């Protein structure tokens, strides 16, 4: 395990909302919600910290957000402007290193082991980047500093907003032991529910399990979690990373025969895929359905649409059509997955912030 790398994860604080509050003084100090008209079927893209105090969060239906925060200010947002500001932030990063791996408009990994300024302390690099972003752009960022990407990302969320958390190799396991497993990068709702059923709530709980037992219960997730909680993750910062597909799949606790359960899973997946596509500023043209039967036979079916989309309803309709064509209801299903491929950058004027 290489512990000599110096990795920073920068995560902008409530990015879209903060840009709007910076540019529009009338929004400052008020609950601002970006996601469109609450009277329509939309989702929250992000919201200000003032709105979060009411329980509003990203991916929440705007109607629900309006009930939680009746005095909230709802706007559609300006994606082209957010991209412009994101590029300004990226330019600040590039003053320190060219090894930058963007995850979305508002977050990125930086490898500053050998940085352009010759600074020995990654902590000082992170602080300087935070200060520069604030001084030049009037925005705050949180930072996590560690020797691998997994820990750096968790650390960046530890002291939001405008915080910095440093985790050394010596501190890594103790730090991870206190973290709820729901905060582990890559642990989604389904995996979290499985972990909770196993009595695993924190990193400390996770460490009590053997590698074999975790793999038996969680398959590939178990393999990765066993290593992550011990600080064993050597994924490099990849400046050339480009997502070729966006998808979601789940293994059922019990084999499923009911097509309605399968369709419900596809609807949930479509919403999650839409959310990720919007964050990546991409849309796709090919929908792929994956089914694994109880005997472990696996099939994949795909449908190429007439136009590119990041719309959950269109993605779901295509996946549901593939399901009806593929599944007879005679054999039970162990796993179902939905993926959108054939991706390309979305034109800003067409980018959907409203969701469903």
UniProtKB/Swiss-Prot annotation:
Annotated localization: Cytoplasm
Reaction(s) the record says it catalyses: DNA(n) + a 2'-deoxyribonucleoside 5'-triphosphate = DNA(n+1) + diphosphate
Gene: dinB
Function: Poorly processive, error-prone DNA polymerase involved in untargeted mutagenesis. Copies undamaged DNA at stalled replication forks, which arise in vivo from mismatched or misaligned primer ends. These misaligned primers can be extended by PolIV. Exhibits no 3'-5' exonuclease (proofreading) activity. May be involved in translesional synthesis, in conjunction with the beta clamp from PolIII.
Keywords: Cytoplasm, DNA damage, DNA repair, DNA replication, DNA-binding, DNA-directed DNA polymerase, Magnesium, Metal-binding, Mutator protein, Nucleotidyltransferase, Transferase
Family of this protein: Belongs to the DNA polymerase type-Y family.
Chain positions of site Substrate discrimination: 16
Highest taxon listed in the record's lineage: Bacteria
GO BP, one annotated term: error-prone translesion synthesis
GO cellular component, as recorded: cytosol
Name of the molecule in the record: DNA polymerase IV
EC number: 2.7.7.7
Subunit annotation: Monomer.
Active site: 107
Cofactor note: Binds 2 magnesium ions per subunit.
Domain UmuC: residue ranges: 7-188
Binding annotation for Mg(2+): 11, 106
Top-level enzyme category: transferase
PANTHER family: DNA POLYMERASE KAPPA (PTHR11076:SF33), DNA REPAIR POLYMERASE UMUC / TRANSFERASE FAMILY MEMBER (PTHR11076)
Organism this protein belongs to: Listeria monocytogenes serotype 4b (strain CLIP80459)
Essential cofactor(s): Mg(2+)
């Amino acid at each position: 395990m290489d512990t000599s790398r110096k990795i920073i994860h920068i995560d902008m604080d409530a990015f879209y909302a903060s840009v709007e509050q910076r540019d529009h003084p009338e929004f400052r100090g008020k609950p601002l919600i970006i996601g469109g008209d609450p009277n329509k079927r939309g989702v929250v893209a992000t919201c200000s910290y003032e709105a979060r105090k009411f329980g509003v969060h990203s991916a929440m239906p705007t109607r629900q957000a309006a009930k939680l925060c009746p005095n909230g200010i709802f706007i559609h947002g300006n994606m082209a402007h957010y991209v412009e500001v994101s590029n300004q932030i990226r330019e600040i990063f590039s003053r320190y290193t060219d090894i930058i791996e963007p995850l979305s408009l508002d977050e990125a990994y930086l490898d500053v082991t050998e940085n352009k300024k010759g600074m020995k302390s990654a902590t000082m690099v992170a602080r300087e980047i935070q200060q520069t972003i604030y001084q030049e752009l009037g925005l705050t960022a949180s930072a996590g500093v560690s020797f691998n990407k997994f820990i750096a990302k968790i650390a960046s969320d530890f002291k939001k907003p405008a915080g910095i958390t440093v985790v050394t190799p010596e501190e890594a396991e103790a730090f991870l032991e206190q973290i709820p497993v729901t905060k582990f990068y890559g642990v989604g709702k389904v995996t979290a529910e499985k972990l909770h059923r196993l009595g695993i709530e924190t990193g400390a709980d996770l460490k009590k399990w053997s590698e074999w037992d975790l793999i038996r219960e969680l398959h590939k997730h178990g393999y990765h979690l066993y290593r992550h909680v011990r600080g064993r993750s050597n994924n490099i910062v990849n400046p050339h990373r480009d997502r070729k597909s966006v998808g979601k799949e789940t293994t059922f606790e019990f084999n499923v025969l009911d097509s309605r359960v399968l369709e419900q899973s596809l609807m949930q997946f479509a919403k999650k895929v839409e959310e990720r596509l919007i964050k990546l500023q991409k849309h796709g043209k090919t929908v792929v359905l994956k089914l694994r039967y109880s005997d472990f036979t696996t099939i994949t079916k795909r449908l190429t649409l007439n136009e590119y989309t990041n719309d959950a309803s269109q993605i779901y309709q295509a996946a549901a059509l593939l399901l009806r064509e593929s599944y007879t209801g005679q054999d039970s299903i162990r796993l179902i997955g939905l993926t959108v491929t054939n991706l390309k950058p979305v034109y800003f004027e067409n980018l959907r912030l409203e969701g469903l």
